[in-house]
Design a protein with these regions (language model features):
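Short beta-rich binding modules
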Residues: 1-157
Length: 157
C-alpha cells in the first residue's frame, strides 16, 4: 500500500494540536490525482512546492526533514478571517530559517518523480517520515508562529 501524509492543525478549546495522518492512496494510477489533492487539502486551488532535505535544530538536538513535496491551499489566507498556522508544515516549508511565511490549512506531503508527478510514499517511507515529523513536533512549542497578512500586488502592463 502507498501513502500520502496529511498534516492538519486542529483548533479546539484546548488550543491547537498538530496532526500527522498516513492516508492510503487508492488511486487507479500510481500518481496522486489533482482531485485527491483538492479533497485532502479541502480547497479548489493548490500550490505545489518541492523542499530539499533539511537539518533543523531544536533544543540542541538535530532533526532531519526529508526531501518532500508540499501540496497546500493556494488561497487559504484569502478565504479565512483568522487563519491558523499549520506549524509542522510551516517548519518543513522553511519558516523561521528560510523565510517568515507560514502555511495554513491542510498540507499534503508526497514526493515528485522525474516527470514531475506527485507520488505517494511506500509504507516504509511513510513510517520513517511520520517518525521524523513526530520528533520535530515534540519540539515545535519552542517556536512562535505569526501568520502573514494576505497581500495582493497588482502590476500594470
Amino acid at each position: 500500500m502507498n501513502y500520502a501524509i496529511l498534516l492538519k492543525t486542529v483548533v479546539d478549546a484546548n488550543g491547537t494540536t498538530n496532526s500527522v495522518e498516513k492516508v492510503p492512496m487508492m488511486e487507479v494510477f500510481p500518481t496522486i490525482s489533482l482531485e485527491s489533492m483538492y479533497k485532502l487539502c479541502e480547497c479548489e486551488f493548490v500550490d505545489i512546492k518541492d523542499m530539499p532535505l533539511q537539518l533543523v535544530e531544536f533544543d540542541g538536538e538535530l532533526g532531519i526533514i526529508p526531501a518532500v513535496t508540499l501540496v497546500f491551499d493556494e488561497e487559504f489566507l484569502l478565504k479565512n478571517e483568522k487563519p491558523v498556522a499549520n506549524e509542522l508544515a510551516s517548519v518543513i516549508y522553511g519558516y523561521g530559517r528560510l523565510h517568515d511565511q507560514c502555511l495554513c490549512g491542510n498540507v499534503l506531503l508526497c514526493y515528485t518523480n522525474e516527470e514531475g508527478d506527485c507520488m505517494p510514499f511506500s509504507e516504509g517511507e511513510a513510517n520513517a517520515i511520520v517518525k521524523c515529523l513526530t520528533k520535530i513536533n515534540n519540539h515545535i512549542g519552542d517556536m512562535e508562529f505569526k501568520v502573514q497578512k494576505p497581500m495582493m500586488k497588482f502590476m500594470t502592463f
